[in-house]
């Protein structure tokens, strides 16, 4: 097998026009979005939002080709933000998957031209089922638009593609419309971060919102007694690898903590640490977290007080562990 040589990016010569083309494409798509915002029919959008709010089934997206890819994304966004939704391929629907659709479902059909054959073939069956239809199209006079209960027009002059063929601007506008509908429904449903986390338990946000500090805390808390020497404190902080040490009273309860910062501040104030005890260096009544505190609340508290480690306590106010902001 011959060795494959990758081109050296530094030695490649790029026609400056290509960079100009990139800027022009971004500018044209940005202008198209601005134009859509200015020309949108508020009455049609209000009707669409009412249809979505009152839908007792699923909001089903369908589209062919690139429109289908965008439809999948819109459906995924709706589903993850509290609006039950799925995507159905129009060709597959016409060959049996119509059985997935109930009369309670709302259909959003995507076709820039409004004349996509596979989409139009679905319309008679959907009307026979009694489904409401929303069209996203660039042609308000198209067959699809005329058969829809509500029409969201793209108001697009041309595709960004120099040949005006590849779906570019139309897919950007359609995606933006989908996001706009999803965000509007988030406001309508008062969809909060906790709700979002329920649908994203495997993601970072879901973990932070659904996980308690007790689930992730470290149980081995480095500790010293009130009369511990400076040397002992340093040894426990170093061996504990937490940048802090808990100071225990005679009954084993929490008397305070000593952090790296406490040591520096004490040294700046006193000048010498050789004869200091833990009781002299510690911060009394340190911040703590109950075991049932959610991770996101712990992070907020740490950021507010500019600390990276907090001790965790149980209902009896006994220290049971510690949690770091990056755990």
Curated annotation (Swiss-Prot):
Matching CDD domains: CBS_pair_SIS_assoc (cd04604), SIS_Kpsf (cd05014)
Primary enzyme class: isomerase
Protein's recorded name: Arabinose 5-phosphate isomerase KpsF
Binding annotation for substrate: 82-83, 89, 95, 121-130, 155-157
Species this chain originates from: Escherichia coli O6:H1 (strain CFT073 / ATCC 700928 / UPEC)
PANTHER family per UniProt: ARABINOSE 5-PHOSPHATE ISOMERASE KDSD, PTHR42745
Metal-binding found in the keyword field: yes
UniProt GO BP: lipopolysaccharide biosynthetic process
Phylogenetic classification of the source organism: Bacteria, Pseudomonadati, Pseudomonadota, Gammaproteobacteria, Enterobacterales
EC number(s) from the headed UniProt entry: 5.3.1.13
Domain spans labelled CBS: 217-273, 282-327
Catalytic activity entry: D-arabinose 5-phosphate = D-ribulose 5-phosphate
Residue numbers marked as site, Catalytically relevant: 66, 118, 159, 200
Pfam family, one: CBS
Family label: Belongs to the SIS family. GutQ/KpsF subfamily.
Keyword annotations from UniProtKB, A to Z: ATP-binding, CBS domain, Isomerase, Lipopolysaccharide biosynthesis, Metal-binding, Nucleotide-binding, Repeat, Zinc
Domain SIS: 48-191
Binding sites annotated in the UniProt record for Zn(2+): 89
